[in-house]
């Protein structure tokens, strides 16, 4: 994950001081891309321990179309707590948009099911896309989508994915985002009988919060270790039937975790 550390260093050295919605302040660059060959290992940051349980359960929660934090709480995940209302609801965030995008004529469009059908029936299509950026519902969301738009691409029997992330918290959020979408590519590839290719991450406003700078310097002092491997223990009947226990990360040898406050 040297490219992740290189990005942190770039933001520190070249970033512009900017105000932000949370009032914390950031150092920010605009427009950055990283490519991870998923054949070479699972891109889980090793220079600090990442909470894999949260990554997996959050993705399963998205895939189920859920927008209430009860499932997350039931599974020991608290990463969405700060944005939920008193009933645990977040409004029409990722799960709603991925699984039940509301059309102008009143239909609910299951974008993920459509993508699976395209990958199996028309893998050369240039329209294999999922968007969470529903302009008509942004004002109802507890938090506008940060990872907003992703596209799949099939070549030589391998499935690749590119994500556009309009806003990126490099220290806290980005390791989760990279691992989450890499996991999704593995799941999609298994369902479509494809090998995994690349995960391409593209960032818009790519920033370090001012209260994460000390932690960033600590992380940059650590030498990256070998990437772990992902094992999927079974092939469910559909993308929506995976369970937490289906996944195992082997040979993950990270440095200790580094705590940092979340900007809300």
From Swiss-Prot:
InterPro entries named among the record's database cross-references: Thymidate_synth/dCMP_Mease (IPR045097), Thymidate_synth/dCMP_Mease_dom (IPR023451), Thymidate_synth/dCMP_Mease_sf (IPR036926), Thymidylate_synthase (IPR000398), Thymidylate_synthase_AS (IPR020940)
User: Which is a GO BP term held by this UniProt record?
Assistant: methylation
State the reactions this protein catalyses.
dUMP + (6R)-5,10-methylene-5,6,7,8-tetrahydrofolate = 7,8-dihydrofolate + dTMP
Q: Which CDD domains match?
A: TS_Pyrimidine_HMase
A GO cellular component term found in this entry reads: cytosol
* Residues annotated as binding dUMP: 21, 126-127, 166-169, 177, 207-209
Instruction: Give the pathway.
Output: Pyrimidine metabolism; dTTP biosynthesis
Q: What residues sit in the active site?
A: 146
Q: Where in the cell is it found?
A: Cytoplasm
Residues annotated for (6R)-5,10-methylene-5,6,7,8-tetrahydrofolate binding in this entry: 51, 169, 263
**What does the annotation say about its assembly with partners?**
Homodimer.
Family of the protein in this entry: Belongs to the thymidylate synthase family. Bacterial-type ThyA subfamily.
Per its record, how is this protein called by name? Thymidylate synthase
């Amino acid at each position: 994950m040297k490219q992740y550390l290189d990005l942190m260093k770039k933001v520190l050295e070249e970033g512009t001081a900017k105000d932000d919605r949370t009032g914390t302040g950031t150092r920010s660059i605009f427009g950055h891309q990283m490519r991870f060959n998923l054949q070479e290992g699972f891109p889980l940051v090793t220079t600090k321990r990442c909470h894999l349980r949260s990554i997996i359960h959050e993705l399963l929660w998205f895939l189920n179309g859920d927008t209430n934090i009860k499932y997350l709480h039931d599974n020991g995940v608290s990463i969405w707590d700060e944005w939920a209302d008193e009933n645990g609801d977040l409004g029409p965030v990722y799960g709603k948009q991925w699984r039940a995008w509301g059309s102008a004529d009143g239909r609910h469009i299951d974008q993920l099911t459509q993508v699976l059908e395209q990958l199996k029936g028309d893998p050369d299509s240039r329209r294999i896309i999922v968007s969470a950026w529903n302009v008509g519902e942004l004002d109802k969301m507890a938090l506008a989508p940060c990872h907003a738009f992703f596209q799949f691409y099939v070549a030589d029997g391998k499935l690749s994915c590119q994500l556009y992330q309009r806003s990126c918290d490099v220290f806290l959020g980005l390791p989760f985002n990279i691992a989450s979408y890499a996991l999704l590519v593995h799941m999609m590839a298994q369902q479509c009988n494809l090998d995994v290719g690349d995960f391409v991450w593209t960032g818009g406003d790519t920033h370090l919060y001012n209260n994460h700078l000390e932690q960033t310097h600590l992380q940059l002092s650590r030498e990256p270790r070998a990437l772990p491997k992902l094992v999927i223990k079974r092939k469910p009947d559909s993308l929506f039937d995976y369970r937490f226990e289906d996944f195992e990360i082997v040979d993950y040898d990270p440095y200790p975790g580094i705590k940092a406050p979340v900007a809300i």
